[in-house]
From Swiss-Prot:
NCBIfam families: CrliSynInhib, PRK03641.1. Keywords: Signal. This is UPF0319 protein YccT. It comes from the Bacteria. InterPro entries: UPF0319 (IPR018635). The lineage of its organism: Bacteria, Pseudomonadati, Pseudomonadota, Gammaproteobacteria, Enterobacterales. Residues 1-20 form the signal peptide. Belongs to the UPF0319 family. It comes from Escherichia fergusonii (strain ATCC 35469 / DSM 13698 / CCUG 18766 / IAM 14443 / JCM 21226 / LMG 7866 / NBRC 102419 / NCTC 12128 / CDC 0568-73). The keyword Signal applies. It holds the Pfam family DUF2057.
Length: 220
């Protein structure tokens, strides 16, 4: 791969307003996993939105809401973990719209057959695939990343296999034989996804060091 081509690929990872989607967070939605990666609660604390790249995305979350009980009591309702997959290719904003969940009858119906809407900035529905994430492990705390990886490999209703692939061991990126050398065609997409993900995790100095390294790589 030519260094110039790699640099262009990396440049695509940088935040660009015209190619970003704003996911508006809801106080009644507890986001657990985003695109195969666990979401840190400290990262979301106080935030009302998340910036996403345009393209396919997958959210794993629970609905948490105080509901009315018979006799004027209240309790906290927590839904089973849900998986929502959708595409933001031509969408600049995503908003949650939950159904009415005011009492035990409504939450019981929601548990049995979850439904919700994702709306764009013009309040138009976004096509979404919704499913319940069945937890296979009894371990505590729940490894949501691992559960989502298994789900995405199982061809379920809201599965996105590309996010299961991204959970694979990335040790080869650090080995003597780089994935950047003689990449077979079927690995091109995976490699690009990994580059984008790890580049965005790095601090500005690390990004700059990587770009300098890329410029020095010989043409293949």
């Amino acid at each position: 791969m030519k260094a110039g081509t790699l640099t262009l690929l990396i440049a695509l990872c940088l935040p660009i307003s015209v190619s970003a989607t704003t996911l508006r967070l809801s106080s009644e939605v507890d986001l657990l996993v985003l695109d195969g990666k666990k979401v840190s609660s400290s990262l979301l604390r106080g935030a009302d939105s998340i910036e996403l790249e345009n393209g396919p995305h997958q959210l794993v979350f629970r609905v948490e809401k105080t509901i009315q009980m018979p006799g004027h009591g209240e309790r906290l309702y927590i839904s089973p973990p849900l998986v929502a997959s959708f595409n933001t290719q031509l969408i600049s904003q995503v908003n949650f719209r939950l159904p009415s969940l005011l009492n035990e009858q409504e939450t019981a119906h929601f548990d049995a057959a979850p439904r919700l809407e994702l709306l764009d900035g013009d309040a138009m529905p976004i096509p979404v695939k919704l499913d319940i994430l069945a937890i296979t492990s009894v371990a505590k705390p729940i490894d949501y990343e691992g559960e989502v990886e298994r789900y995405n490999k199982s061809a379920k209703r809201a599965s996105l296999p590309q996010f299961a692939t991204m959970m694979a061991d990335d040790s080869t990126l650090l080995s003597g034989v780089s994935e950047l050398d003689a990449i077979p065609p079927q690995s091109q997409v995976l490699t690009e996804q990994r580059l984008k993900y790890w580049f965005k995790q790095a601090d500005p100095q690390t990004r700059n060091n990587f770009l300098q390294w890329a410029e020095k790589q010989p043409s293949s």
